[in-house]
């Protein structure tokens, strides 16, 4: 599809980073040290927009949570943890120096760990452990990069083009862990053990988008030449997650894998130097993905199951929710003139024009898979027969529908509004015959394919949905380092290191203090005798 968009900032994406810059800095000059410790907050247009978007999604999810979590024992604790999670994301968005970045980055990891483990069962505990360990890798890489930035005498990463390649590589790898790019993708589907409001917030504009946001901030360093690592890993992540979503039967995990696929698209566009298009897709995706998770929560709450093989007849029980799910699925496919269409099509067309054959083919196949699993959700959940006759009651009440309809208009109109904002109001869309045929073919084949491939065999389904046994591979890879760490802890910190270090010093200190106390509190005869012996000792030796 040939799209002509008169975007004044398309070829100069740095303008996006320099509009409305209002620096507010406090320099704490350390005496006799050449290093200036700077705490700064820089307000620019892109940061302000994503902050408003995160605030909009967070407010609607909090309203949704107050009704969805009604009846839970520790609902107040849950709400406070959600507020901490949102505050960490706000701190990350508003930061422009390494220290505040680290506080927000680490706060997201800790609060997400607590929220995933909200339900007290083995699945939640194991999922929380996978999440925190994966995010710890990114935290270590961030700390490492901050240590290297110390030698540049500033932690302000507003202009990172002056930094070395090693610092950029550390930031890229840390963003891979937070945004669940290969090979750190295992934790994202596992995080679906959390309550549905947490999933809605995590996958729309907070945790998983933190890595993308960091790469957008660092994009001036590589947007001219591109980054082939981001291109390849983004395309592979999008392809494997789309294939896994096609073989998955858990409704929430399918939506989570669709998020992972779109994160791969964003990384792919960043690697090509299409920073504005990546930001556009992040904006559009956040609008309909939060809505899609909230609708899935209504369906799961009404039917009492998450397995889409046991769902059906939802359109007759939940007509409004079914309609919103259909609109969100079409937007996820990139159906013309919905929010997902504008950004995704720009990325695909630009990737074709840049003549990168293998990643572009993978991205086209990923778009086909996106249409396939989105159609499968609609076919199984909305159109098929309901086999769960004991749970036919509706949860479509005013309290649930209010946040859904607020975000619905964003999912329908948000992409076009964003396009008007960054094009100056001059937008013309011309559909060429060849590329419009390619777009319609991808959507049509994706819609028809689930009717022919209605089910996988058990072994094939497990193989595909696990992203080619990625959790097993990454788990076995981390087994030996964790085992060595446990052995070093028990044999070292709790063994001979403890006995030869702190314990020995403690015992010797106790003995010395006891002897000193005995000498100072003894009768005068003992004190005089000890003084005499000490004098004789000093005289002869």
From Swiss-Prot:
- Catalytic activity field: a ubiquinone + NADH + 5 H(+)(in) = a ubiquinol + NAD(+) + 4 H(+)(out)
Example GO BP: ATP synthesis coupled electron transport
Q: Where is the signal peptide?
A: none
- GO terms, molecular function: NADH dehydrogenase (ubiquinone) activity
Query: Any idea of its EC number?
Result: 7.1.1.2
Does the keyword field hold Membrane?
yes
Subcellular location, in the record's words?
Mitochondrion inner membrane
Q: Which GO terms describe its cellular component?
A: mitochondrial inner membrane
Q: Which key words are in the record?
A: Electron transport, Membrane, Mitochondrion, Mitochondrion inner membrane, NAD, Respiratory chain, Translocase, Transmembrane, Transmembrane helix, Transport, Ubiquinone
- Entry membrane topology: Multi-pass membrane protein
Instruction: Report the principal subcellular site.
Output: mitochondrion
Q: Where are the transmembrane segments?
A: 17-37, 48-70, 74-94, 98-118, 130-150, 157-177, 191-213, 226-246, 263-283, 285-305, 322-342, 353-373, 404-424, 429-449, 455-475, 518-538
What's its job? Answer: Core subunit of the mitochondrial membrane respiratory chain NADH dehydrogenase (Complex I) that is believed to belong to the minimal assembly required for catalysis. Complex I functions in the transfer of electrons from NADH to the respiratory chain. The immediate electron acceptor for the enzyme is believed to be ubiquinone.
Give the similarity note.
Belongs to the complex I subunit 5 family.
Q: Which protein are we looking at?
A: NADH-ubiquinone oxidoreductase chain 5
Species the sequence originates in: Artemia franciscana
